[in-house]
């Protein structure tokens, strides 16, 4: 039996109406029960993805790519006056809420219009991502307006948000996994492990709804060409702290580059960025080297570094130039030389290795990679419990132009997508922060034509955003121009020269210190923040958390983090 989109939206409204995580879980369980009652296990996949503002699975690295301007044009095409919709958006601060309030003004094509099903909405939105070429914008507007016309105000509320991929109901992957754990009577930590490997909440949901054996189902195992989120490190206050905690850690050079995940099956190679983008065609020289590795199939992880003629790292932006280049690869390849320092192996000859300790994974890696690979090198490492030797290795890593050291527990397994306490990073300066732009204000003087000041935010456990300051320095005029063009495409509303934007642009911020402050809800503020880099290789999921801020604050005050 088909599930109506309105049935889902009614429960989404309940979820949005509470701030309590347990209540959100209980309401989500109502959706699971609806799926079971209607015998529609495939629909739980769609519900889960929609709940977190996605039409596609994370590993697919696809977006609808519809900005507020196209959505507003689609709304206008249904019969709502442009000034009316703009004023209502300004009053509510949300296109979805504004559309719900004005939904009665939409011209209905028929009094007997059939309400859209969940499947119909999902299929219509997936089509949007395939529309390209001439007249594509008009075609997208026509598709969006066709589904809006069939929808009730509550459906329009969530349709608008889903089109912008920002549902604002406070659902996160951990909350969904909590609901699964309770309803299907499965340990949450087991579900977290499976999700980390498949990187697809919809697939896991569908398998649970089908009552599959989730522990032995082949589709729920680590697979070649289905990238996973990388394991992330925490910050530590000193080398000695790490030795006290781990005994004899494995120290590795922290390279000044971009993380890559390399998949190989027979003679086919795919390389993914940290955001899980397929960058294979942009770095052909690395692809050719990977083909020469003697392995039937594998997944390895490393840091891609741009090198100058003296063997020292070039600026980070040069790597992004290579990753973004789609055409004339040969010319930029000769200009920007790349090398990948491989530090982990996750899969080898049809076997997942992520449950093996690091010391065993490293041993396998060292047998596979040899010095004959010019563009692929194993990361420099030192395993020791001697602080002086570790300090010398750290100083050497800095002397060759890199950022510091990674400190890893040799007995630790690989935990995809988690910021773990078995891997730390140690650098000579305070850790920079990855934040997302939430508002932008026009500049002054010669920069008055561009957005020049940005409100920036970090996240909490549930991925809610919290402002931590404003930043305006550190950007070139070219970067300001490019940012302004990007912001125009993701602007939700503009009030007094300040644009409220979709949280999609990630900045790396340096600062003098983190201060306690009651100015912002998170309780902290940045002193003298400055943009270090525009991180096009990162998404909102990669930004720092309030927990990270607290840890850095403790370290700068000499309290440590252990």
Swiss-Prot record:
Organism from which the protein derives: Methanococcus aeolicus (strain ATCC BAA-1280 / DSM 17508 / OCM 812 / Nankai-3)
Annotated catalytic residues: 254 (n6-amp-lysine intermediate)
EC number: 6.5.1.1
Cofactor: Mg(2+)
Catalysed reactions listed for this entry: ATP + (deoxyribonucleotide)n-3'-hydroxyl + 5'-phospho-(deoxyribonucleotide)m = (deoxyribonucleotide)n+m + AMP + diphosphate
GO BP, one annotated term: DNA recombination
Protein name (record): DNA ligase
TM helices/strands, residue ranges: none
Coiled-coil boundaries: none
InterPro entries, A to Z: ATP-dep_DNA_ligase (IPR050191), DNA_ligae_ATP-dep_bac/arc (IPR022865), DNA_ligase_ATP-dep (IPR000977), DNA_ligase_ATP-dep_C (IPR012309), DNA_ligase_ATP-dep_cent (IPR012310), DNA_ligase_ATP-dep_CS (IPR016059), DNA_ligase_ATP-dep_N (IPR012308), DNA_ligase_N_sf (IPR036599)
Gene: lig
Binding site for ATP: 252, 259, 274, 303, 343, 419, 425
Family: Belongs to the ATP-dependent DNA ligase family.
Sample GO molecular function, one term: DNA ligase (ATP) activity
Annotated function: DNA ligase that seals nicks in double-stranded DNA during DNA replication, DNA recombination and DNA repair.
Annotated keywords: ATP-binding, Cell cycle, Cell division, DNA damage, DNA recombination, DNA repair, DNA replication, Ligase, Magnesium, Metal-binding, Nucleotide-binding
Lineage, broadest ranks: Archaea, Methanobacteriati, Methanobacteriota, Methanomada group, Methanococci
């Amino acid at each position: 039996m088909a599930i109506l989109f309105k049935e889902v939206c009614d429960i989404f409204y309940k979820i949005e109406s509470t701030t309590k995580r347990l209540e959100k879980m209980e309401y989500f369980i109502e959706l699971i029960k609806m799926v079971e009652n209607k015998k529609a296990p495939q629909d739980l996949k769609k519900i889960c993805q929609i709940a977190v503002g996605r039409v596609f699975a994370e590993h697919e690295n696809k977006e609808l790519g519809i900005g507020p301007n196209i959505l507003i044009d689609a709304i206008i095409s249904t019969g709502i006056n442009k000034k009316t919709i703009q004023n209502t958006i300004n009053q509510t601060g949300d296109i979805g809420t504004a559309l719900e309030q004005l939904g009665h003004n939409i011209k209905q094509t028929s009094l007997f219009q059939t309400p859209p099903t969940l499947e119909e909405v999902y299929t219509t939105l997936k089509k949007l991502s395939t529309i390209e070429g001439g007249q594509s914008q008009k075609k997208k507007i026509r598709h969006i307006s066709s589904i809006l016309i069939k929808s009730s105000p509550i459906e329009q509320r969530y349709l608008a948000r889903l089109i912008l991929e920002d549902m604002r109901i406070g659902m996160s992957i951990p909350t969904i996994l909590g609901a699964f754990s309770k309803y299907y009577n499965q340990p949450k930590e087991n579900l977290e492990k499976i999700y980390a490997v498949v990187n697809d909440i919809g697939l896991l949901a569908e398998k649970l709804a089908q009552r599959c054996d989730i522990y032995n189902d082949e589709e729920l195992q680590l697979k070649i060409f289905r990238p996973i989120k990388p394991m992330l490190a925490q910050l530590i206050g000193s080398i000695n702290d790490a030795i006290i905690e781990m005994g004899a850690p494995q120290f590795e050079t922290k390279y000044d580059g971009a993380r890559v995940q390399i998949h190989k099956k027979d003679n086919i190679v795919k390389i993914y960025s940290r955001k899980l983008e397929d960058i294979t065609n942009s770095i052909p020289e690395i692809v050719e080297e990977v083909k020469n590795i003697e392995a039937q199939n594998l997944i390895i992880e490393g840091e891609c570094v741009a090198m100058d003629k003296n063997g020292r790292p070039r600026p980070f932006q040069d790597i992004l130039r290579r990753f973004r280049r789609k055409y004339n690869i040969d010319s930029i390849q000769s200009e920007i030389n790349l090398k990948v320092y491989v530090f982990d192996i996750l899969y080898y000859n049809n076997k997942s290795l992520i449950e093996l300790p690091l010391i065993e994974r490293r041993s396998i890696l060292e047998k596979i990679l040899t010095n004959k690979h010019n563009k692929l090198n194993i990361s420099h490492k030192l395993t020791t419990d001697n602080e002086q030797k570790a300090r010398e290795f750290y100083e050497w890593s800095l002397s060759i132009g890199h950022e510091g050291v990674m400190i890893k527990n040799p007995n630790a397994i690989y935990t995809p997508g988690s910021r773990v306490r078995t891997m730390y990073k140690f650098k000579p300066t305070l850790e920079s922060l990855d934040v997302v732009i939430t508002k932008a204000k026009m500049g002054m003087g010669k920069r008055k034509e561009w957005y020049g000041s940005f409100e920036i935010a970090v996240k909490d456990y549930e991925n809610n955003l919290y402002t931590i300051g404003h930043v305006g320095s550190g950007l070139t005029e070219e970067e300001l121009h490019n940012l302004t063009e990007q912001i125009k495409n993701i602007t939700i509303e503009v009030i007094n020269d300040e644009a409220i934007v979709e949280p999609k642009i990630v900045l790396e911020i340096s600062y003098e210190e983190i201060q306690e402050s009651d100015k912002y809800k998170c309780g902290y503020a940045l002193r003298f923040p400055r943009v270090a880099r525009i991180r096009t290789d990162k998404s909102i999921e990669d930004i720092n958390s309030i927990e990270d801020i607290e840890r850095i604050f403790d370290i700068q005050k000499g309290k440590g983090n252990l």
